[in-house]
Amino acid sequence: MKLQINSSWQERFLADPPREKDHRPPFRRDRGRILHSAAFRCLQAKTQIHAIGENDFYRTRLTHSLEVAQIGSSIVAQMKLIDSFISLAQQLKEDRAELQKQLKLILPSNDLIESLCFAHDIGHPPFGHGGEVALNYMMRHHGGFEGNAQTFRLLTKLEPYTPNAGMNLTRRTLLGVVKYPTILDRSSPQYHQGVIVDNVDSKYVKISAWKPGKGIFRDDLKMFEWLLEPLSENDRTLFGQYKKERTRPDEVLKTRYKSLDCSIMELADDIAYAVHDLEDAIVVGVVTFQQWQSAVEKLTECRSEWIVENVQSLSQKLFSELHYERKNAIGALVNYFITHVRWKINNGFSEPLLRYNAELPDEVIEVLTIFKHFVWEYVIKHVDTQRVEYKGQRMLTEMFQIFDSDPLRLLPRNTAMRWQKATETDRKRIICDYIAGMSDAYALRVYQQL
């Protein structure tokens, strides 16, 4: 087995040679562009969990992204170790040491994985799921809205590093942030079929009725097609394959495959969400020890021996009044997930970046799912979170309508100029871009001004 990465993955949409005496490799340049972008800085004013409120301890989307980057780098280090190849070597009937020697060559550098982790949330709008639903509803006849799609759009078009190619990042970096390689309006529920009635007052949109699909905006199809040019026709077709076909008009379709780099980033994001968001909620009292017992009952029945043996002591430490004990438990959990990451093969692909992924064994996924479900049930669905998101949802829908009614008067000058030059469909997207780029606090200030 001889693996080689196509040099096309280091290409940029626009020619962009390094400046004089700039000897940084391509992915370090990408990392710098993301790190110094306005969109990245804006994450410091976007709250990770709204139920936690104003507390010096709580995480923002910026600190969350930094922690995801640290976990991502640790996963890359884990995937260099011989033990991470055991399952793959058995499956392929190949020598572990030879697999290790070859596959280490295609792992992302720390610069690359940190770039993906820094960028993974920059397209998410203010007020979390409520903001996302609000913008998806307002864009329902114009391609929809979804946070991951907006991330791709920011990186490839909106961030003003170039006139029309966003940050002009390398192909491999862009491939790594694409979690759902399809077009959004294909994967979204078929609202137009009348299953979901389109006559509700926008201020009272039901969040479950306008959940967006997962994919890339059709407006950004040109950049998406350029991104996939190095792939064979078979790989492109397989890459966009859905997990299953739609059986109900209101069903969201999700794609089956991701790139190697994206699979690492997504695992890091899931671990941070499941463990660190739980830590925040415990510290400020959003969840109680009694509520946590519902998760403990499930964890004691898991197939993971380590979890079964340690769940009681971990629980005591998580809710201990001694801060160092809680941090010890959090560190142990993060280490547990990271050290179980292993290699996975996606048969059918010829491109190494798609053929190989990172994964967790089924018994560890079971544990991670219990943690994520607990955070969802007791933190994300907490009434305080839902009220803040609902308030934000109403604010964003109303702001969209106000800007749409008199854009040249009410939009900032640069945004108004872009709106004036755009087609009717593009005009809606420009208003959406402006609102999606706001922080929670800025959106509130603008709403109060209006």
UniProtKB/Swiss-Prot annotation:
Annotated SMART domains: HDc
Lineage top rank: taxon: Bacteria
Domain HD stretches: 61-274
Membrane-spanning segments: none
Keywords, sorted A to Z: Hydrolase
Gene Ontology terms: biological process: dGTP catabolic process
PROSITE patterns membership: HD
Keyword Ribonucleoprotein appears in the UniProt entry: no
Protein's UniProt name: Deoxyguanosinetriphosphate triphosphohydrolase-like protein
Natural source organism: Histophilus somni (strain 2336)
Species classification: Bacteria, Pseudomonadati, Pseudomonadota, Gammaproteobacteria, Pasteurellales
